[in-house]
Amino acid sequence: MSDNRRSRMITEGPQRSPNRAMLRAVGFGDNDFTKPIVGVANGHSTLTPCNAGLGALAARAEEAIRAAGGMPQIFGTITVSDGISMGTEGMKYSLVSREVIADSIETVVNAQRMDGILAVGGCDKNMPGALIAMARLDIPAIFVYGGTIKPGHYKGRDLTIVSAFEAVGEYSAGRIDEHELLEIERHACPGAGSCGGMYTANTMSSAIEALGLSLPGSSTMAAEDEEKALSAARSGEVLVEAIRANRTARQMLTRKSLENAIAVVMALGGSTNAVLHLLAIAHAADVPLTIDDFETIRQRVPVLCDLKPSGRYVATDLHRVGGVPQVMKILLNAGLLHGDCMTITGQTIAETLADVPDEPPANQDVIRPFSQPIYPQGHLAILRGNLAEEGCVAKITGIKQRRITGPARVFDAEEECLEAILSGKIKAGDVVVIRYEGPKGGPGMREMLAPTSAIIGAGLGDSVGLITDGRFSGGTYGLVVGHVAPEAAVGGTIALVEEGDSITIDADARLLQLNVSDEELARRRAAWQPRPPRYTRGVLAKYARLVSSASLGAVTDRFSE
């Protein structure tokens, strides 16, 4: 069979002469119409350093695709900056953008009958958005990550964007002055690349590498290093090879490979958002996966990497000592990865890792040996209780206090909570509740990095709990619980919490409990009324109508289940 399995529908035969005429206008010649047409979904944008370098990577991939015998066609897809929109109404559009990215890539690739897709992305939702599209399309596909930002430096310590968020809390608490705040701001982001710790972007790029849909070692490269450009070019070559072999995305996106990705996220100490995104990718690929599968894998996979936000190092440090392949080799040797999973290169995971050392390098402590983990079990725990009958997600490593019972401090929006923290109204022992911020209620399930960073900056990170039906940034740490489901907007128990109620968060018992009698809860539930939608027109209104529970990945196309 020819390599242009799909695009021949628009390039072959006399009736397609008008189609060919238009393609000639964008560079096709007589000998190009039998070549595979390869889409390059380019997320380049100067909105954010995460995506500022993507144009050059897309160009390198385009050149390589052409040299390998394909016909590349570049098209744009969107991004929003989570870091810039954080703490504002604009953050409601962040998770929405995952769906827009997925829908836009699916739309273009299917409309133009492309034979393969290479997606280039950087900011948080670029990665899952692209993977959801690849899973729906099930054609040869590869992802090129824009790369991580290098750490900033100030007064002998490494800085990331989270340093700037935490500095706001420190300034409000009087722990640093305005000059110190400004200097941290000036040094936190020294150039192009995605946020440098094991936050959401680096977590998801690592997960994609574990899934086999990006090149080995590519997920921790620095955005501004030449090896990243070389990796983009090689990705184009590999994709053309995959088109010739008809190696499609769902051959990589299997139950086993998703279990591999979850294991790698746990070993890295990755973002809570990985739960949401991997559930959504599994849904798009028609692979059964539930929130409880994360808990099962967590209990057997240790945290091996000492990475920010709760650790000391950033992604470039991880790359220097072997990157994700080194972590995967350790897990493979421990029987915690499925080595028979296929990758886009045509090799299995085990074959890909064959030449990777069995142990991490000596004289470093970024990656620990399996026998000396940072934590014996994974860090993303699934909690349940009467406050989260469908489950919720807690990052339980890097915290000193693993259980808290305290009075609820209830806020119906992120802004109200942040104001209370910055004005000193939150005290040690409190359990902060931020609700009506879920997928439907926000809508858009905003990340609560500003409130959690303010709590850390105020010196309350070890003594205040926070629960929300919203999300957390990958940069969040502390005694925090997100993705509470059912959410407040649909009448979940979190909507029934009243100021001063006793709430227990117990990381070890995996419990989130409102300490109120069943009779009182029944009375409150009978009196509860749904709130009118915050938006009645536009994309947020559409999203609120379509989106599923966070426990199902907050997808927008779950219609028949």
From Swiss-Prot:
Family listed: Belongs to the IlvD/Edd family.
Domain of life: Bacteria
Record-given protein name: Dihydroxy-acid dehydratase
Residues modified to N6-carboxylysine: K125
Organism: Chloroflexus aurantiacus (strain ATCC 29366 / DSM 635 / J-10-fl)
PROSITE patterns named among the record's database cross-references: ILVD_EDD_1 (PS00886), ILVD_EDD_2 (PS00887)
Protein's gene: ilvD
Known function: Functions in the biosynthesis of branched-chain amino acids. Catalyzes the dehydration of (2R,3R)-2,3-dihydroxy-3-methylpentanoate (2,3-dihydroxy-3-methylvalerate) into 2-oxo-3-methylpentanoate (2-oxo-3-methylvalerate) and of (2R)-2,3-dihydroxy-3-methylbutanoate (2,3-dihydroxyisovalerate) into 2-oxo-3-methylbutanoate (2-oxoisovalerate), the penultimate precursor to L-isoleucine and L-valine, respectively.
Annotated keywords: 2Fe-2S, Amino-acid biosynthesis, Branched-chain amino acid biosynthesis, Iron, Iron-sulfur, Lyase, Magnesium, Metal-binding
Subunit-structure text: Homodimer.
Gene3D superfamilies: IlvD/EDD C-terminal domain-like
Segment forming the signal sequence: none
Cofactor: [2Fe-2S] cluster; Mg(2+)
